[in-house]
A protein has these predicted regions:
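The beta1-alpha1 cofactor-binding region of Rossmann-like NAD(H)/NADP(H)-dependent oxidoreductases
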Residues: 41, 59-71, 103
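Conserved glycine-rich cofactor-binding loop
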Residues: 9, 16-17
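Substrate-binding pocket helix/loop in short-chain dehydrogenase/reductase
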Residues: 96-98, 105-107
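Conserved NAD(P)H cofactor-binding loop of Rossmann-fold oxidoreductase domains
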Residues: 89-94
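A short, exposed helix-loop element centered on a Lys and neighboring polar residues
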Residues: 121-122
Length: 148
């Protein structure tokens, strides 16, 4: 079965490398217009060129409300909307036992891995999907199921 996403738009956080980049490339190859976000502009620019199909990018901190707003507004104005939101950006600043993690690392992990996907989803819904429908994909890893 061939995947067709003609006429659809996708916004992929953490889309400049790894799973996010692969998802963005798969969507673009299936005909979707794609925006990727990530922290580093140079990495975003290279990834967008490799993804192809007119992929656009917006560099910024996934947890920054101004970045969220700017990326979503740009996706709507330049690509026509946000039919698919992929919350892929994640961090794991500390891979040791939880009891040894310091509070700033813990807060960063919670902010990036839990608060940011909630905020992106809420903002996309308020700005676009509420009246147009859509799909939200939240990506996670086995790290969310294992303890140390």
């Amino acid at each position: 079965m061939e995947l067709s996403l003609q006429g659809k738009t996708a916004l992929v956080t953490g889309g400049s490398k790894g799973i996010g980049k692969s998802i963005a490339k798969t969507f673009a190859d299936a005909g979707a217009k794609v925006m990727i976000t990530s922290r580093k502009a140079d990495v975003c620019e290279t990834a967008a060129a490799e993804i192809g199909n007119g992929c656009v990018w917006e560099a910024g901190n996934v947890g920054d409300p101004d970045h969220m707003e700017q990326a979503i507004d740009r996706c709507v104005s330049e690509l026509g909307g946000v039919d698919v939101l992929v919350n892929n950006a994640a961090t794991n600043p500390y891979a040791g036992p939880m009891i040894d993690a310091d509070l700033p690392r813990w807060r960063k992990t919670i902010d990036v891995n839990m608060t940011a996907p909630f905020a992106w989803t809420q903002l996309v819904w308020q700005k676009y999907q509420k009246d147009n429908g859509g799909v939200v994909l939240n990506i996670s890893s086995v790290g969310g199921l294992e303890t140390n």
